[in-house]
């Protein structure tokens, strides 16, 4: 799905938004990607390993998931501070504030996404179905709403939703791993 959908969307988007609109969204995506990477702090890779290791111990799994989620949210707040400082201080970025604010939701949605938990628990069918469903919805939204050169912010929002809305579903679906009460203290050092 990561290869097929761009093959369908790119010709349409480049014809409608032209190089200028596509370039604005690509620059915003690149900037957000760096801050999202900082916010994630390697947690996805570590989270897969830890959740796979403790998946048979429910209490340990709940604790590890909570600890990693808290760390991820704290790092996202720090990353947001740096991101918005940069957006408002650099004129080229400040001129496109709306686009950069819309694109910044990627940082938040990635922090609550906890896809690493599902990979650690080897729930690949869920991951695949969810990912394809949201990409199809985004494809439909793209063809319905992006019709003019000025729709580049809307295109940015749709691309964020295509990539990150599944993280909201992950968070809602993971309530059995996050919102259970753990009877041991959280340990942020492991």
Predicted regions located by residue number:
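Interhelical loop/hinge segments that connect adjacent transmembrane helices in multipass membrane
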Residues: 125, 152-159, 168-190
């Amino acid at each position: 799905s990561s290869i097929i959908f761009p093959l369908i969307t790119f010709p349409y988007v480049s014809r409608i938004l032209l190089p200028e609109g596509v370039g604005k969204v690509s620059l915003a995506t690149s900037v957000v990607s760096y801050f999202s990477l900082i916010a994630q702090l390697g947690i996805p890779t570590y989270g897969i390993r830890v959740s796979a290791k403790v998946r048979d111990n429910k209490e340990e799994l709940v604790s590890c998931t909570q600890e990693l989620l808290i760390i991820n949210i704290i790092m996202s707040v720090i990353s947001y501070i740096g991101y918005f400082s940069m957006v408002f201080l650099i004129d080229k970025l400040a001129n496109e504030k709306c686009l950069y604010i819309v694109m910044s939701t990627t940082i938040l949605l990635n922090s609550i996404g906890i896809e690493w938990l599902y990979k650690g628990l080897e729930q690949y069918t869920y991951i695949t179905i969810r990912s394809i469903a949201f990409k199809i919805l985004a494809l439909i939204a793209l063809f319905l709403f992006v019709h003019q050169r000025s729709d580049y912010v809307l295109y940015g929002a749709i691309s964020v939703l295509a990539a990150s809305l599944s993280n909201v579903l992950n968070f809602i679906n993971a309530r059995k791993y996050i919102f259970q009460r753990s009877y041991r203290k959280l340990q942020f050092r492991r």
